Regions:
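Conserved, well-structured ligand/cofactor-binding cores
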Residues: 1-148
Length: 148
């Protein structure tokens, strides 16, 4: 188990899960429909995150190492999402765990996407999930964006 901390407190997450504390809180707080987010919507979200990373790099807010890590992670996640769209592999659904009707302005989905990008970037860099010193879901992946 790994421990992750946010402004509310600390939670334990299995070492093997790619999502983080905000996603887990959302699932516990908003267990609405049990349905999955449409993979086309996940892909669109990932494409927006890619554009944000590219922009943040171009204007000097992300250094080259963080930028490359984030881009590689997003590219990997887009490939997984494409497989879900083609209905050949559902791996992405073990990562994007929030309910489509998770209440509010999309904060839970945004944080779920931020966490899986950050943790995938960490994994590709040989780091453990949740070791956010290299890539942080809010400070790096969500840089220059609202959490909503």
């Amino acid at each position: 188990m790994r421990k992750e901390k946010d402004n509310i407190g600390t939670l334990n997450l299995p070492d093997t899960v790619v999502y983080g504390i905000h996603s887990l809180r959302a699932v516990n707080n908003f267990p609405v429909s049990g349905e999955r987010i449409n993979p086309n919507f996940i892909k669109a979200y990932l494409q927006v995150k890619l554009a944000a990373a590219e922009t943040n790099f171009k204007i000097g807010l992300l250094d080259n190492k963080k930028y490359e890590c984030i881009v590689k992670a997003i590219e990997k996640l887009i490939l997984e999402t494409n497989k879900a769209i083609e209905e050949t592999d559902n791996t992405i659904f073990s990562k994007v765990i929030v309910d489509p009707y998770q209440g509010g302005a999309g904060t839970s989905l945004n944080m779920n996407i931020n966490e899986i990008i950050a943790n995938t970037a960490l994994e590709l860099s040989g780091k453990n999930f949740g070791d956010y010193d290299l890539i942080h879901p809010i400070d790096d992946v969500n840089l220059s964006q609202s959490t909503n």
